[in-house]
Amino acid sequence: MSAIKEVKSELRQFMKTLLGKISKEETQRQTEAVFEKIIESKWFQESKRLSVYVSTSGEIQTDSIIQKALEMGKEVFIPQFTKGSTAMDMVRVPDQTAFDNLPSTLWGIRQPEPKWKWQSYHETGPLDLILAPGVAFSPYGLRCGHGKGYYDRFFSTHHKHFPENSPKKIGLALREQIIGTIPISETDVELDEVIYEGETIIFDTI
């Protein structure tokens, strides 16, 4: 294991313990604060095709964001991945009822069954906004994911499909997920902003 991978592994273990101590009530309180900042933002209001992660424990909850986006008539895409694959697709949520009935699959993450054949984003065009999760975030726009590399590869794949279209990349964080620094490798992709209760960190105003 390389030095960077080892440090990231230790960071994930530390954050897992830390985030496990946060109550559901506190997570919900911070989620509501982040939700208000998101729906009031210009980039959310103007977005037409956005990707939103489907939340689990220990992170900002996204059900209300997805519901709001659908109510506003936006095209909402969520992650879909399969066991043994390193690739992650973003597939369109048909409607609120379909989202509410998502089964819990790998790692307890809700996603559609492959046989449902939800439409992939690249069949109809680029995304203009991606709301990404993470284990930890730095004050400089770096994120530490869960170690599978799904989002970094997805960012790269989106660029290959649509090199002229760069979606806004936003990280959503609990306050406890903001740390001083994160070791990086050449495949790590920087975010444009990190949104959390009490503050917004902007790294790229393009």
UniProtKB/Swiss-Prot annotation:
One of its GO terms (biological process) is folic acid-containing compound biosynthetic process. It catalyses: (6S)-5-formyl-5,6,7,8-tetrahydrofolate + ATP = (6R)-5,10-methenyltetrahydrofolate + ADP + phosphate. Substrate binds at V54, E59, H146, G147, K148, G149, Y150. ATP binds at K8, S9, E10, L11, R12, R143, C144, G145, H146, G147, K148, G149, Y150, Y151. Its main location: cytoplasm. Mg(2+) binds at D152, D188. It comes from the Eukaryota. InterPro entries: FTHF_cligase, FTHF_cligase-like_sf, NagB/RpiA_transferase-like. The keyword Metal-binding applies. Pfam families: 5-FTHF_cyc-lig (PF01812). Keywords: ATP-binding, Cytoplasm, Ligase, Magnesium, Metal-binding, Nucleotide-binding. Its EC number is 6.3.3.2. Its cofactor is Mg(2+). It is found in: Cytoplasm. GO terms for cellular component: cytoplasm; mitochondrion. It is an enzyme of class 6 (ligase). Belongs to the 5-formyltetrahydrofolate cyclo-ligase family. Contributes to tetrahydrofolate metabolism. Helps regulate carbon flow through the folate-dependent one-carbon metabolic network that supplies carbon for the biosynthesis of purines, thymidine and amino acids. Catalyzes the irreversible conversion of 5-formyltetrahydrofolate (5-CHO-H(4)PteGlu) to yield 5,10-methenyltetrahydrofolate. Monomer. This is Probable 5-formyltetrahydrofolate cyclo-ligase. It comes from Caenorhabditis elegans.
